[in-house]
Amino acid sequence: MAQPPPDVEGDDCLPEYHHLFCPDLLQDKVAFITGGGSGIGFRIAEIFMRHGCHTVIVGRSLQKVTTAAKKLVAATGKRCLPLSMDVRVPPEVMTAVDQALQEFGKINILINCAAGNFLCPASALSFNAFKTVVDIDTIGTFNVSSVLYKKFFRDHGGVIVNITATLSMRGQVLQLHAGAAKAAVDAMTRHLAVEWGPQNIRVNSLAPGAISGTEGLRRLRGSNASSKLKHFSNPIPRLGTKTEIAHSVLYLASPLASYVSGIVLVVDGGSWMTFPNGIKQLLEFESFSAKL
């Protein structure tokens, strides 16, 4: 079985990198990445920059994205603009996009990676908790996509990749809120691909599985989730890595996928087909993880 590419657990750049794609695949492109200060979004920014792209990374904490940007610039030599923005607030989105366009003069790629999630039975889910996840995942994705379309993509074309999830593919216990929010984003992907395709705008979703070294995995499964994976029969029996997700996003964002639009690319080692889907099993998983 092929070994996964090297990765690091925290929000740090890779100590070394071997190109699997042409190093100038995204030469002089500019990518606007929500949630780019940590986790999957951070690694997407790094991999894009290692392939010639400049990036704008946005998040609610300016300090966090500024720290991340310094790491990215030091590791890749490309430009990275950190901006504070809440995807739920359209005026903030408009301001951030204006700042990015002022800095770079263009935005070629949008990665919607901002998200929020937690485990909760539907019966215990508060109105506000459900709304919060939908506001970040679904409304936030629409807000940023809409603003970028009006300010640049409508006249110049572009690429949008929405980071979603496999939760809605079969229904998942304890994940009604996130599953519903991400399913809506996948539907949005298809609608926008149809409506905006004639203006040379490609729109796709990428649905990761369980990915090591992410805050999402730590929140959902405990700090030692990796060691528990062997108890489940994933077709590819390991966690995915942030670098693997970033490589898949790189493909969708690049000219390699020039005729790909309106799809949901699942990158989870096949786990959506076999992951346990009973409350008892998942609660046991949580209990086991908490003791490790």
From Swiss-Prot:
**Where is the PTM N-acetylalanine found along the chain?**
2
Q: What is its main location?
A: other
**Which residue positions does Phosphoserine occur at?**
287
InterPro entries (alphabetical):
DECR2-like, NAD(P)-bd_dom_sf, SDR_fam
Top enzyme category: oxidoreductase
> Which EC number(s) does the record attach to this protein?
1.3.1.124
The UniProt catalytic activity note for this protein reads: a (2E,4Z)-dienoyl-CoA + NADPH + H(+) = a 4,5-saturated-(3E)-enoyl-CoA + NADP(+); a (2E,4E)-dienoyl-CoA + NADPH + H(+) = a 4,5-saturated-(3E)-enoyl-CoA + NADP(+); (2E,4E)-hexadienoyl-CoA + NADPH + H(+) = (3E)-hexenoyl-CoA + NADP(+); (2E,4E)-decadienoyl-CoA + NADPH + H(+) = (3E)-decenoyl-CoA + NADP(+)
Please give the positions of the paired cysteines in each disulfide bond. none
Q: Where does substrate bind?
A: 60, 88, 118, 126-128, 219
Residue positions where N6-acetyllysine is found in the record: 64, 151, 291
Task: List GO molecular-function terms, semicolon-separated.
Answer: 2,4-dienoyl-CoA reductase (NADPH) activity; GTPase binding; protein-containing complex binding; trans-2-enoyl-CoA reductase (NADPH) activity
Per the UniProt entry, what is one GO biological process?
unsaturated fatty acid biosynthetic process
The places in or outside the cell where this protein is found are:
Peroxisome
Keyword terms: Acetylation, Fatty acid metabolism, Lipid metabolism, NADP, Oxidoreductase, Peroxisome, Phosphoprotein
Residues annotated as binding NADP(+): 35-40, 60-64, 86, 182, 208-214
Q: Which Gene Ontology terms of cellular component type are present?
A: peroxisome
Chain ranges for the short sequence motif Microbody targeting signal as given in the UniProt record: 290-292
Q: Which Pfam families match?
A: adh_short_C2
What family classification does the UniProt entry report for this protein? Belongs to the short-chain dehydrogenases/reductases (SDR) family. 2,4-dienoyl-CoA reductase subfamily.
Query: What job does the chain carry out?
Result: Auxiliary enzyme of beta-oxidation. Participates in the degradation of unsaturated fatty enoyl-CoA esters having double bonds in both even- and odd-numbered positions in peroxisome. Catalyzes the NADP-dependent reduction of 2,4-dienoyl-CoA to yield trans-3-enoyl-CoA. Has activity towards short and medium chain 2,4-dienoyl-CoAs, but also towards 2,4,7,10,13,16,19-docosaheptaenoyl-CoA, suggesting that it does not constitute a rate limiting step in the peroxisomal degradation of docosahexaenoic acid.
Q: How is the quaternary structure described?
A: Monomer, dimer and oligomer.
Under the heading PANTHER family, the entry gives: PEROXISOMAL 2,4-DIENOYL-COA REDUCTASE, PEROXISOMAL 2,4-DIENOYL-COA REDUCTASE [(3E)-ENOYL-COA-PRODUCING]
Q: What is this protein called?
A: Peroxisomal 2,4-dienoyl-CoA reductase [(3E)-enoyl-CoA-producing]
**Source species:** Mus musculus
